[in-house]
Amino acid sequence: MRITRREKKFWEQHLSCVRHITLDPKGPGVVRLHMIPPRAEGKDEPFLLLLNGAKLIPLNLSWAILLANFMAALEHFFTEGDNAPDREVKQADWERLAEEAVTATRSVYPRTKPEQLREDLALLMESLIAIARGQEPPVEVGTLSLGDYAPYMSAPHRMDLMVSAMTQDGAWHCNQKCLHCYAAGQPMGESRELTTAQWKEALERLRHANIPQV
């Protein structure tokens, strides 16, 4: 199914990269969200929502746009003041941010009633929080395996990097004491360590490749 001009413009401006927020709702645990674009534009290919680094949830384009606008509102909330990183999101703030997301989403879907978007956003967030806590969501949400989503992936959802060389000059070099080490004894275990500038370049390349977790 083809996407509209408004959807295409929004996708190019706001959905071509990985979007991320971490929520700390009342109750146990946090909700860490990575929204990853599919390989190609189109309504038939779902976005991937990576929930707490483990659960994979497909998201259609309209809900991806709604969630992206809510993420943007939250990001602005936490960067608009000197003490922004320590601010608590009170109920009145949450409702205001949700309303900002609804207004922004209506610029893409002007014929959709605000009430419908408010209900959709509330249902989406309630469902994601429930899934993150291992509870039943208010509506049935289809989860995916990596094998199911592989044809649509624009990049791997995780990249593990070896920070330190395991050995140098034939002697053990790593200062970590991990219970299980899968880097020991590997052919690249004695590779030359990167400089700070090289690490920054590597991380920037991973960001541009849409790999959400490192």
Where would I find each of the regions flagged by the language model?
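Acidic, low-complexity/disordered tracts enriched in E/D and polar residues
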Residues: M1-F78, A84-R87
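Intrinsic-disorder-associated interaction segments
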Residues: T4, R87-W94, P110, P114-L121
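Short acidic, hydrophobic short linear motifs in intrinsically disordered regions
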Residues: H76-V108
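Short, polar/flexible loop-turn hinges at active-site or ligand-entry regions and domain interfaces
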Residues: K55, Y109-P110
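Conserved alpha-helical substructure of the radical SAM core
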Residues: V108-Y109, Q116-S127, I131-V214
